[in-house]
Each structure stands twice: as structure tokens, then as C-alpha cells.
From Swiss-Prot:
GO terms for molecular function: protein folding chaperone; unfolded protein binding. Disulfide bonds join C235-C237, C268-C271. Keywords: Chaperone, Cytoplasm, Disulfide bond, Redox-active center, Stress response, Zinc. Its main location: cytoplasm. It comes from Streptococcus suis (strain 05ZYH33). This is 33 kDa chaperonin. GO terms for cellular component: cytoplasm. One of its GO terms (biological process) is protein refolding. Redox regulated molecular chaperone. Protects both thermally unfolding and oxidatively damaged proteins from irreversible aggregation. Plays an important role in the bacterial defense system toward oxidative stress. Pfam families: HSP33.
Length: 288
């Protein structure tokens, strides 16, 4: 079970989210059959979107798009306020590692591009916000987005660790934000702690990485846990939803599918679930 823990410093001037997204990224890897670099890039995007979405309320949905010039192409993710996320990567077959360390390469494969966030409040008027990719590592790009676009000083760490067979071993991250009222002394103390923090990969490799993240963020500062919530990879696709999409096509196209193809097969991009619509399904749409 994946989870997110929301916390607030005793002073009320800092808040932090810590996430275990291991099963989320495992599921994404299994559904899309991604190779190492693609797994890490997609996983980081899913974690970033979980953080963005749980920060919203109600039925808001967040679409995060990494529109990259590099080999990954585009990474698309959609999440709701419960931290339920789905996503896919345009190129799932990237597998590049540094020869000396075996470290999975992501940044150069993402390259330049845009970090685009679409916030849908359900009003019919989604809000778009976009910043340039500054490193392609996604975590740094996410932090830049929060600071530049949302005007909220933030520290972010997120990563995906793979085992020797390139399967997801652990995935997760954190978000630390400065809230109104924080003093310069407090900010300096937290900044120093973040600068001296071990690499996110080593924290995730800890036996209890959630507690390791909290300890690294807060040190000796007191904090309270506001909530602990389940999160995960969840796709809300259905045969009825795709049937509605087919119903929007011209009847001549539906007739052609029925007569020439004897039906139609559709695969959900987000979860790779296959749906088959036979001649009877198409006939009902044509006569509907």
C-alpha cells in the first residue's frame, strides 16, 4: 500500500509531504513494460503529480505533461486529490546507464522542453501553468515550477530505485514548502538542513524511508502529522467511456468500421487495457 503523510512544523511556518509511491510505479512499469530510463522518468512524473494533486481539494484533477525534446518524447499523467494517478510515456524502451556507476540516465534523454500543469476544477475552464524544463531530471524541474509558477519557495526530492533486474525496488519523494510567517532564521535553518540532506536515493534505500525522509527534513524541529492517506496507480477508463467516444464519430466512419473491420479494438493509453467493440455495438451506435 502506497501512502502520503502530510505534516506541519510546530511553528506552522513549514509543511512537508512525504510519499511512498513504490506500488504506484511498479504498476506503471508492469502496465507499460517500460525499460530502465523510461521507468524512472515516468515514475518521477507520477510522483510529482501525486504531490501536486493531493495539495488540491474536491474533484479537482491535475494533468501533468512533460513535453520533452529528447528521446522520451512526452510523459503524460493525470491525478486526483486522493493521489490516484495514471500515466504513460511516449517512448517506453529507453535503457541507458552510466558505465562506471550503473546509474540510470534520465536528464539527457528528456532534454529541453516544457513542464505543463493543467488544473481542472470541474468548471469547464481549466487553468494552465507552464515553465521550461531546467534539467530534464523532473525533480528539479518540478521544484522550479513550484517556485516560479506558484510563487511558493519549495524543496523537492523524488526518485525511483531499480533492482539488478531493472524492476522497481522503491519509489517515493518529499515536498517541503515555506508558509507565510516564516522568519529568516527559520528559513536559513531549514535551507541548511536541506543542503546537507543525504541524496534522495540513499534516503529511499533506508529500511523505513518514510521516517528517514521526515527525519532529514525536520531534524530536531518538532512537527505534527496531519494525515496519512493511501495513494496509488488507478485508471478510471471503462468500456462505456470509450463507447461514448465512439458515439461522437460520424456515422459513416462507424459504418465503415462495422462493414470492413467487423468491429474495432481500442487500447487505453494510460493503463493498456484492451476493449473490443463488435458489430452489434457499432450497430447500436449507428442507430442510436
Amino acid at each position: 500500500m502506497d501512502k502520503i503523510i502530510k505534516t506541519l512544523s510546530k511553528s506552522g511556518h513549514f509543511r512537508a509531504f512525504v510519499l511512498d509511491s513504490t506500488e504506484t510505479v511498479k504498476t506503471a512499469q508492469e502496465k507499460h513494460d517500460t525499460m530502465a530510463s523510461s521507468t524512472v522518468a515516468l515514475g518521477r512524473t507520477l510522483i510529482a503529480n501525486q504531490i501536486l494533486a493531493v495539495n488540491e481539494k474536491g474533484d479537482t484533477k491535475i494533468t501533468l505533461k512533460i513535453l520533452a525534446s529528447g528521446a522520451v518524447g512526452a510523459i503524460i499523467s493525470v491525478a486526483n486529490t486522493k493521489g490516484q494517478v495514471k500515466g504513460y510515456i511516449q517512448n517506453p524502451d529507453l535503457d541507458y546507464k552510466r558505465t562506471a556507476t550503473g546509474e540510470v540516465i534520465v536528464g539527457p534523454l528528456v532534454g529541453n522542453g516544457q513542464f505543463l500543469v493543467i488544473t481542472d476544477y470541474g468548471t469547464g475552464h481549466p487553468y494552465n501553468s507552464m515553465t521550461p524544463l531546467i534539467s530534464g531530471e523532473i525533480g528539479e524541474d518540478f521544484a522550479y515550477f513550484l517556485t516560479d509558477s506558484q510563487q511558493t519557495p519549495s524543496a523537492v526530492g523524488l526518485n525511483v530505485l531499480l533492482d539488478e533486474e531493472d524492476k522497481v525496488k522503491v519509489a517515493g519523494g518529499f515536498l517541503l514548502q515555506v508558509l507565510p510567517g516564516a522568519t529568516e532564521v527559520e528559513i536559513a535553518r531549514f535551507e541548511k538542513r536541506i543542503q546537507e540532506m543525504p541524496a534522495i536515493s540513499s534516503l529511499l534505500a533506508s529500511e523505513n524511508h518514510i521516517e528517514a525522509l521526515l527525519s532529514a527534513i525536520y531534524g530536531d524541529d518538532d512537527f505534527k502529522r496531519l494525515s496519512e492517506e493511501e495513494i496509488g496507480f488507478v485508471c478510471d477508463c471503462s468500456k462505456d467511456r470509450f463507447l461514448d467516444a465512439l458515439a461522437s464519430l460520424p456515422k459513416a466512419d462507424l459504418q465503415e468500421m462495422k462493414e470492413e473491420d467487423k468491429g474495432v479494438d481500442i487500447t487505453c493509453q494510460f493503463c493498456q487495457t484492451h476493449y473490443h467493440f463488435d458489430e452489434n455495438d457499432l450497430e447500436e451506435l449507428i442507430n442510436g
